[in-house]
Curated annotation (Swiss-Prot):
Modified residues (N6-acetyllysine): 33, 145
Sequence segments annotated as region (Disordered): 1-34, 115-160
Basic residues bias (residue ranges): 1-26
Protein's cellular compartments: Cytoplasm
Main function: Component of the large ribosomal subunit. The ribosome is a large ribonucleoprotein complex responsible for the synthesis of proteins in the cell.
InterPro entries per the UniProt record, alphabetical: Ribosomal_eL29 (IPR002673)
Gene3D superfamilies for the chain: 6.10.140.1730
Name of the protein in its database record: Large ribosomal subunit protein eL29
Modified residues (N6-methyllysine): 5
């Protein structure tokens, strides 16, 4: 006799309803608020008879965390000032210098760059220093900021 189409195969419905209708994940673990649901799912502690194991594990974790905090407090001196970590190009520079292979080359390369970028000091002789001062004194007094120069006039040019 052929199977009727409107009946499921044996035990299918029992299999579907074995776990019951599940609540949404946010409401699934009411008694263990504050515990990461992912953690519960991974460790299979969501079942009621295993909650004791979870509580023990949580207690052990808390003890370990507090012990670690105490150890850190004992090691770290509160009055010591932390050195500031350089940011951006300074950090990059330090990283290059500390590099085992690139360190030697980069030092000379950076030194050369610094030499090229330095502003050159203006060297003036005594006679040269007096000449521009006289030129400024002999030039006519400048007009106030708001006043405009006549149309054909040009700005005064400084003497070399």
């Amino acid at each position: 006799m052929a199977k009727s189409k409107n009946h499921t195969t044996h035990n299918q419905s029992r299999k579907w309803h074995r776990n019951g209708i599940k609540k949404p994940r946010s409401q699934r673990y009411e008694s263990l608020k504050g515990v990461d649901p992912k953690f519960l799912r991974n460790m299979r502690f969501a079942k009621k008879h295993n909650k004791k194991g979870l509580k023990k594990m949580q207690a052990n974790n808390a003890k370990a965390v507090s012990a670690r905090a105490e150890a850190i407090k004992a090691l770290v001196k509160p009055q010591a000032i932390k050195p500031k970590m350089p940011k951006g190009p300074k950090l990059k520079r330090l990283a290059f210098i500390a590099h085992p292979k690139l360190g030697k080359r980069i030092r000379s390369y950076m030194a050369k760059g610094q030499r090229l970028c330095q502003p050159k000091p203006k060297v003036q002789t005594k006679a040269g220093a007096k000449a521009p001062a006289k030129a400024q004194a002999s030039a006519p007094a400048q007009a106030p900021k708001g006043a405009q120069a006549p149309k054909g006039a040009q700005a005064p040019v400084k003497a070399p």
